[in-house]
């Protein structure tokens, strides 16, 4: 828009000043920290859950098909993808009357509990149902998280805010990977 004035400077000092302004925005910092921790939980699908399924999953036969830990991981990812693709519009319609913060919190809690119990349970049907549960949480919390992100960013410093928030994913990856090493001493819930 013509009335939008970007306040970004082009010098290295201006870049430091831009990021310093983000550090003064305590609410956005808290949101970014939450994004890091949520990313750590989500990345367990790539990091800890395969290890858990390999070591702890109780192999079973479902409808005559042998299900190993590796197959269970594929089934869980398939369930997640299928539900997201088929029900995102329905979930948005069912939650459109909810206020943004309660919707975000509800979805996050459902997702986090689903993931927590995924690393505790070892049987096919429990993990099958938990994959549905954490996917429902994801469906509920993702739309408001995008709205919150957009509403919290200073319009004149979108690049700085976006760049700062983009650091959340690599930080989450580092922490999620470290949790595999930590889990060797803490056990299944580490």
Go through each PLM region and give its residues:
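Structural signature of the two symmetry-related core transmembrane helices
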Residues: 102-117
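Helix-to-loop junctions at the C-terminal end of transmembrane segments
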Residues: 86-100
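A membrane-interface helix-boundary motif in multi-pass transporters
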Residues: 182-190
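Loop-to-transmembrane helix entry/capping segments in MFS-fold secondary transporters
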Residues: 70, 153-165
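Juxtamembrane intracellular "pre-TM" segments in multi-pass secondary transporters
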Residues: 2-32
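Intracellular juxtamembrane helix-capping segments at the cytosolic ends
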Residues: 140-154
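Pair of pore-lining "gating" transmembrane helices in MFS-fold secondary transporters
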Residues: 24-45, 132, 136
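Short amphipathic helix-loop junctions that connect adjacent transmembrane helices
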Residues: 47-72
């Amino acid at each position: 828009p013509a009335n939008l004035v970007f306040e970004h400077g082009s010098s290295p000092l201006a870049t430091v000043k831009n990021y310093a302004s983000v550090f003064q925005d305590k609410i956005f910092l808290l949101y970014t920290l939450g994004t890091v921790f949520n990313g750590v939980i989500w990345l367990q699908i790539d990091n800890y859950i395969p290890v858990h399924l390999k070591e702890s999953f109780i192999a079973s036969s479902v409808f005559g098909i042998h299900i190993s830990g590796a197959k269970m991981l594929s089934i869980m990812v398939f369930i997640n993808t299928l539900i997201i693709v088929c029900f995102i519009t329905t979930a948005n319609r069912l939650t459109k009357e909810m206020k943004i913060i309660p919707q975000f919190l509800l979805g996050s809690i459902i997702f986090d509990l689903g993931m927590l119990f995924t690393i505790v349970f070892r049987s096919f049907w429990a993990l099958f149902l938990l994959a549905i549960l954490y996917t429902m949480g994801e469906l509920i919390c993702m739309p408001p998280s995008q709205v919150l992100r957009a509403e919290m960013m200073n319009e004149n410093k979108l690049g700085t805010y976006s760049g700062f928030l983009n650091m959340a994913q690599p930080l989450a990856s580092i922490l999620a990977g470290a949790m595999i090493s930590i889990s060797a001493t803490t056990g299944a819930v580490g």
